[in-house]
């Protein structure tokens, strides 16, 4: 019974290429599957695959036109507009003004004098550094008679001062006393001993008792009881294999009844006293 394919042509080609790549990697470790196939095709006399045809008429790429020259915004010199033989807007100097397009020394002097005349300048040209929103600088004129210095606790109003009979600049407070000499540091005063310890003996050191609740990182060495089903099963299997009785602790030395016992050794000592 025919069934529709589950993969399209692109997926089939991908799987085929992957199978070829993996089969090459299975027996060769050069890492270049395509180069290896081309080398084998050359050695075995297989002609190389034809190259795809090139386009004989490539598309023509048109170049962008050059940008126009920027407009000239330079202002003409004052007095260069002539009406005798000048241009359309009077921008060039005519022949009737006394020149062939060039400025004479007299014209330059007139232009400099006109630019330096304060009457012909605009307010912005007269004060180039002044801004519209600039604040006006505060200027304080120095008075001829200085205001007398007042005491910090004295009122600044003459009516509130009341009994101020002195002249200007007089203070109601008494003059400051001269600075005293630097005081010397007092002698050290030794504190008396405490009445609880008149002899001056050192107090006994504190007693540090051993810790009761000990916490070990590893289990302390000692007898370890055999507990659990798996532990007893391993113990009985070992006893059956070695023909010995079971133990109750892992640290117990196993006893083997079938092994010959060691002969008793008798030691005689001729010493009268035992230490």
Swiss-Prot record:
It comes from the Viruses. Residues 44-103, 116-207 are annotated as: Disordered. Residues 79-98 have a biased composition (Gly residues). Residues 129-139 have a biased composition (Basic residues). Residues 170-188 have a biased composition (Low complexity). This is ORF2/4 protein. It comes from Torque teno virus (isolate Human/Finland/Hel32/2002). Signal peptide: none annotated.
